[in-house]
Each structure stands twice: as structure tokens, then as C-alpha cells.
Amino acid sequence: MATQTVENGARSGPRRTTVGDLLKPLNSEYGKVAPGWGTTPLMGVAMALFAVFLSIILEIYNSSVLLDGISMN
């Protein structure tokens, strides 16, 4: 037979590791939600600043914004 059976006594539980012990407190907050809006406004500001950054990079790439002293091929 190709399948192998394992007796209940031979099965081992999950191994404990140092990294797992360090990360366990982070997982204990799973499922908990802060009341209200939380950090949503901060995320909105970060997204807006990132959009401005991307638009500036795009304008430089398209040579819409000319920079003094920098030659573009």
C-alpha cells in the first residue's frame, strides 16, 4: 500500500522556536479592531503624498518639468 498510517503516540505537536516565541505577541492582537476611524486619515495623507510623488516622477520622465543643470538624453 502506498499510504502510511501514523499512530497517535508518534505524532508530534508544533515545534517551538525562538522566532516563533518572539512573534507570538504580534499574533495575539489578531481580530481586534480599534474603535472609530483609527489611523485611516493618516493612511489617506500618505496615499496623497505618494500620488504627488509619482506625478512628479512622471512629469520629470516625460520632460514636462525641466531641471536646470541636468541633461536628459
Curated annotation (Swiss-Prot):
The modification Phosphothreonine is found at residues 3, 5. PSII is composed of 1 copy each of membrane proteins PsbA, PsbB, PsbC, PsbD, PsbE, PsbF, PsbH, PsbI, PsbJ, PsbK, PsbL, PsbM, PsbT, PsbX, PsbY, PsbZ, Psb30/Ycf12, at least 3 peripheral proteins of the oxygen-evolving complex and a large number of cofactors. It forms dimeric complexes. Keywords: Chloroplast, Membrane, Phosphoprotein, Photosynthesis, Photosystem II, Plastid, Thylakoid, Transmembrane, Transmembrane helix. InterPro entries: PSII_PsbH, PSII_PsbH_sf. PANTHER family: PHOTOSYSTEM II REACTION CENTER PROTEIN H. GO terms for biological process: photosynthesis; protein stabilization. It is found in: Plastid, Chloroplast thylakoid membrane. It comes from Lactuca sativa. One of its GO terms (molecular function) is phosphate ion binding. Disulfide bonds: none annotated. The lineage of its organism: Eukaryota, Viridiplantae, Streptophyta, Embryophyta, Tracheophyta. SUPFAM superfamilies: Photosystem II 10 kDa phosphoprotein PsbH. One of the components of the core complex of photosystem II (PSII), required for its stability and/or assembly. PSII is a light-driven water:plastoquinone oxidoreductase that uses light energy to abstract electrons from H(2)O, generating O(2) and a proton gradient subsequently used for ATP formation. It consists of a core antenna complex that captures photons, and an electron transfer chain that converts photonic excitation into a charge separation. This is Photosystem II reaction center protein H. Phosphorylation is a light-dependent reaction catalyzed by a membrane-bound kinase; phosphorylation occurs on Thr residue(s) in the N-terminus of the protein. GO terms for cellular component: chloroplast thylakoid membrane; photosystem II.
